[in-house]
Amino acid sequence: MLFAQKSNQVALFNGKDLTGWNSYIGPPLDDAGKQLSDIPVGLNHDPNHVFTVVDLNGENVIHISGENWGCIYTPKEYSDFHLHLMFKWGKLFWGPKKGKKMDSGVLYFSVGENGADYGAWMRSQEFQVEQGNCGDYWGVAGGMETIPVIKKSDSEYVYSPNGVMTVFSAKSSVGRHCIKQGDAENLTGEWNTLDLYCHGDTSVQMINGKVMMVLYHSSQDDNGKISPLTKGKIQLQSEGAEIFYKNIFVEPLKAIPAEYLQAK
């Protein structure tokens, strides 16, 4: 399927190679997820070719093998933007993810040092990309969001537009994970679209045209100091599973469309 680029969109993937991206890979892990070394593989050093560009059915796409935990990320920071991309799962599992749901993620508003979370990722807000859970939220290394939710169980909270506004962070009583509403993911092996709208401290996470969650008051906890988190780099995770990405575009955003903020 051909993708029509808008005039104000900037392609983050040139369709040829990984020019315009940095890579970072954390310490190697055993099958239980334990670090085999304290030393990360490092910045722009990818001996296992975790991040490559491959020809898939006649189309060049980004291939993330998942063999090591890490990411590719934009050197540039973004605020007030719309990010669009497409992804689909491969078949490979590695290490602690063997036999589990295939997992990746789009980490936005990424700031600070590489490896702040699990030795692999910067502080950020995570748009979860995981089989059956695409659209969930995770706060990464101090990322915090306020989300309207209903309580599903003692430990699970689900996004609901009319729910109780609740702060999600590693230090809050509800934790740093919020479950999206509904399920819009296509069958494994099919391409999915991901759209992320961010303006100010508000974000909308969408899968295949459906609003999964609206998030408010994006902020960060830096050793007890709380401050806004509204600008940062974009990371694409490698987290133990094979995944492909393509058609990655970002464009400036003057306002989040009202219909997405009000979606039920």
Report each predicted region and the residues it spans.
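Carbohydrate-interacting regions of secretory-pathway proteins
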Residues: Q5-K264
